[in-house]
Amino acid sequence: MQVEVFKVKLSDLLCLTKPKQTFLLLLTSIFTYVGAGGMRLDALLLLTAAMLLSISGTTSVNMALDADIDAMMPRTKDRPVPSGRVSRVEALSFGLLLFIVGLGLSYLINPWTAFATSLGMAFDILVYTMWTKRRTPLSIIFGGVAGAAPSLAGWAAARGSIELQAIMIALITILWIPSHIWYISIYYLDDYAAARVPMAPVVWGIERTSKLIVASNVLMIILQLLLFLMGPLGPIFLVLSLPITLRFLIHSIRYARSPSRGEARRMYKVASPVEGVIFLAIALDGIFRILWSS
């Protein structure tokens, strides 16, 4: 009986970390490390452990702090904390423990990696969750900074510092975030309105929000071109990443011409792999450059 209870509790604690989201953010860190020319296996393994723990910990703290909002929305009311299966104190303690261990591991790589890790936690919890999420539709920009922190950490782990190129790569995540969050918030518009969360579709309407998503996608393509033209990334990156971004831009333009809540869910699913493919292209470009120069 105790074993079963332990398994259920462990499953709930794992749920707090949002494994799919955590895995995607972890990949951005690993792929950026490789794209930045990182070749040390020990540093890569340490980075993987540090990011897995720190991202999971930050997400768990976020879940604890957002439990009151989650309890008001049918989509999220069965999550571990709002459902009562895990207490807020348990979720906070679990999350902080994971983050502290992850931060310690990131410092073993170098101080800049630890700085990027801390930046992610600070923006996600203090700026996004506790300050802006319940006040402004622009909160996702600050959430985007948190989402971009793992890629900064990956670059810092490889290069020992955070350079302009790293910031430009991090901007990819920030520009992708509107598609990731706003399409799903269009689909669940009534839930966010009932919970009084000022998401863009609630405050600005579906049409304006869909046009802003198009704008962010255009900027993302410009950024990809700049990363190629300014030199940190080569033709492999552009050839592999640009087609999927252009395809997604076309889909978002079509949606903006005739937006609907039903179609927003499909657009959310179309948006999901875009970031993964872009960062995979960054990694493959880095591998190609290493092989070419050897």
Curated annotation (Swiss-Prot):
Top EC class, one word: transferase
Q: Where in the cell is it found?
A: Cell membrane
- Name of the protein: Protoheme IX farnesyltransferase
**What metabolic or biological pathway is this protein involved in?**
Porphyrin-containing compound metabolism; heme O biosynthesis; heme O from protoheme: step 1/1
Extra information? Carbon 2 of the heme B porphyrin ring is defined according to the Fischer nomenclature.
Reactions catalysed, as given in the entry: heme b + (2E,6E)-farnesyl diphosphate + H2O = Fe(II)-heme o + diphosphate
Example GO biological process term? heme biosynthetic process
- On the tree of life, the source organism's domain of life is Archaea
Keyword terms of this UniProt record: Cell membrane, Heme biosynthesis, Membrane, Transferase, Transmembrane, Transmembrane helix
Membrane-related topology note? Multi-pass membrane protein
Q: What is a single cellular component term in the Gene Ontology annotation?
A: plasma membrane
Q: Enumerate the transmembrane spans.
A: 19-39, 41-61, 89-109, 111-131, 138-158, 166-186, 218-238, 272-292
Disulfide bond positions = none
- Check the record and name the Gene3D superfamilies matching this protein: UbiA prenyltransferase (1.10.357.140)
Just give the chief location class: membrane
The task this protein performs is described as: Converts heme B (protoheme IX) to heme O by substitution of the vinyl group on carbon 2 of heme B porphyrin ring with a hydroxyethyl farnesyl side group.
The UniProt entry, under Pfam families, shows: UbiA
Q: What is its EC number?
A: 2.5.1.141
| An example Gene Ontology molecular-function term | protoheme IX farnesyltransferase activity
To which protein family does this belong? Belongs to the UbiA prenyltransferase family. Protoheme IX farnesyltransferase subfamily.
Q: Taxonomic lineage of this organism?
A: Archaea, Thermoproteota, Candidatus Korarchaeia, Candidatus Korarchaeales, Candidatus Korarchaeaceae
